[in-house]
């Protein structure tokens, strides 16, 4: 992980981001934890370091709204959706695979009413969605555009390298770890 200090210096000096590519979410978190030494202030770290994941890792607010609108006939399902809605309102990142998501919730309410509410089938309608400005996945994308260090998995990094983003925002510096 000795590459993190020079990468962060390069990003600051060049006002550009460095994408760090890893194989697993565990490695993503390990790198983010290591960066807490470079950026001990949590507020500064939140601006400079972003973990990017695919949309299938974030709660889709439209899917949650639709599930709540179809309120299931089973009281247990209604309680499950209530717990998800409560977590969503308190979550800063909506990451269903991250440390802030209570693992016991999946065991309690099942996959369909927890991680099943993510965008798993590519159904995201992006800016046409009423929740676009609050969307957890979009927040992650916007934060990555401003960050010095973006930590992502190999698949997402390769997609970014190939297609980039709006206004020619394709990253130009990459580090592949494992």
Language-model regions, residue ranges each:
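Post-Walker A helix-loop "phosphate-sensing" segment adjacent to the P-loop in P-loop NTPases
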Residues: 10-16
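A substrate-engagement module of RecA-like helicase motors
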Residues: 16-18, 22-148
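SF2 helicase catalytic motif II
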Residues: 169-178
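Walker A/P-loop
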Residues: 1-6
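Glycine-rich, N-terminal phosphate-binding loop of Rossmann-like dinucleotide-binding domains
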Residues: 22, 154, 178
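Hydrophobic/aromatic-lined pockets within catalytic cores
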Residues: 12, 36, 161-162
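Conserved helix/coil segment N-terminal to the catalytic DExD/H
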Residues: 138-145, 155-170
């Amino acid at each position: 992980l000795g590459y993190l200090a020079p990468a962060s210096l390069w990003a600051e000096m060049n006002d550009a981001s460095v994408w760090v590519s890893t194989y697993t979410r565990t490695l993503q978190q390990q790198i983010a934890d290591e960066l807490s030494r470079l950026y001990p202030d949590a507020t500064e770290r939140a601006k400079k370091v972003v973990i990017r994941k695919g949309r299938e890792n974030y709660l889709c607010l439209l899917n949650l709204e639709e599930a709540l609108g179809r309120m299931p006939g089973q009281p247990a399902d209604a309680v499950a959706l209530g717990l998800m809605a409560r977590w969503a309102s308190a979550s800063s990142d909506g990451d269903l695979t991250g440390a802030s998501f209570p693992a016991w919730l999946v065991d309690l309410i099942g996959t369909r009413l927890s991680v099943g509410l993510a965008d798993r089938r590519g159904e995201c309608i992006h800016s046409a969605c009423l929740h676009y400005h609050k969307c957890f996945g979009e927040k992650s994308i916007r934060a990555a555009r401003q960050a010095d260090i973006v930590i992502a998995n190999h698949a997402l990094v390769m997609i970014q390298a190939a297609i980039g983003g709006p206004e020619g925002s394709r990253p130009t510096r990459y580090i592949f770890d494992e």
